[in-house]
Design a protein with these regions (language model features):
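Metal-dependent catalytic neighborhoods of phosphoester/phosphodiester hydrolases
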Residues: 67-75, 102, 217-225
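Active-site metal-binding motif and surrounding structural segment of the metallo-beta-lactamase
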Residues: 38-87
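Catalytic core of the metallo-beta-lactamase
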Residues: 112-168
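Conserved beta-strand hairpin/beta-sheet module of binuclear metal-dependent hydrolase folds
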Residues: 1-47, 138-154, 171
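Active-site neighborhood of phospho(di)ester-bond hydrolases with catalytic His/Asp-centered motifs
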Residues: 32-36, 53-59, 63, 93, ...
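Cap/insert and terminal regions of metallo-dependent hydrolase folds
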Residues: 158-241
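Divalent metal-coordination and catalytic microenvironments
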Residues: 3, 22, 34, 43, ...
Length: 244
């Protein structure tokens, strides 16, 4: 299993960057996790949109779905140019029918509703869900394949259920929208200390901090998280990758 970061900014992308987007690969299957602003452009530097096998969306805030429309256009135009593309499944929840309806576009993409109470099979991946604490319906994901596990918290404030959900994961991709002295609870986001606490309680092997703030010194997020978690910590950046 290999994860590559495409976008890691919270809220909106910095110049020449992208908000949430992560490419997960295993056995030749390519799953894009969220598709925020700037993701399509940055992804094309190393991977083409028509090569995707599936897209899964945690929630429907713009910094996680902004590039779905242009992804659909890219695959449509490539089909006109003779590049055969199958209909791309876009997995999402059904709690916002207005946004979910946009996932189906001609025969280019098709919205597929996941049941948060069941396990979703997507290629080689088995995906389970946990509803997070966020202003809109949002789901964390536990993605497993061949005995390896990735946790994607998506957007959430800290909740104890996440520790059990994330237990013994090989990689915890954890949102970190705030510094340790701040309080992210009302905004539905975690701090660096929350991320470190979650990683420690869940006994994960690696922690990746993402959904980053646009201010302050990002290295401090790692320093603060390390006061709670003694394992390897990385700060998400464009094309950061991890194979496990």
């Amino acid at each position: 299993m290999k994860l590559t970061v495409i976008g890691s900014w919270g809220g909106y992308p910095k110049a020449d960057g992208a908000s949430s987007g992560y490419l997960l690969e295993h056995e030749g299957f390519h799953l894009l996790i969220d598709c925020g602003s700037g993701v399509l452009s940055k992804m094309q530097n190393f991977f083409q949109p028509e090569e995707l096998d599936a897209l899964i969306i945690s929630h429907y805030h713009p910094d996680h779905i902004a590039d779905i429309g242009v992804l659909q256009h890219a695959r449509l135009i490539q089909s006109f140019l003779g590049r055969k593309t199958d209909t791309l499944p876009i997995y999402g929840h059904s709690l916002d029918q207005h946004e979910f309806a946009k996932f189906t576009y001609k025969d280019i993409t098709k919205g597929v509703c996941y049941d948060p109470d069941s396990t979703l099979s997507a290629g080689p991946f088995q995906i389970r869900f946990l509803k997070t604490n966020h202003p809109v319906p949002c789901y964390a994901m536990r993605i497993e394949a061949d005995g390896k596990t990735l946790i994607y918290t998506a957007d959430t404030s800290y909740k104890e259920e996440l520790a059990v959900f994330s237990e013994n994961a090989d990689l915890l991709v954890c949102e970190c929208n705030f510094y340790g002295h701040q309080n992210g609870k009302n905004a539905g986001h975690m701090t660096s200390l929350d991320a470190g606490t979650l990683a420690s309680k869940a006994n994960v092997k690696n922690l990746l901090l993402t959904h980053l703030p646009h201010y302050g010194e990002l290295r401090k997020l790692k320093e603060e998280a390390s006061t709670k978690y003694t394992g390897p910590i990385s700060i998400a950046d464009y094309q950061w990758s991890h194979t496990f």
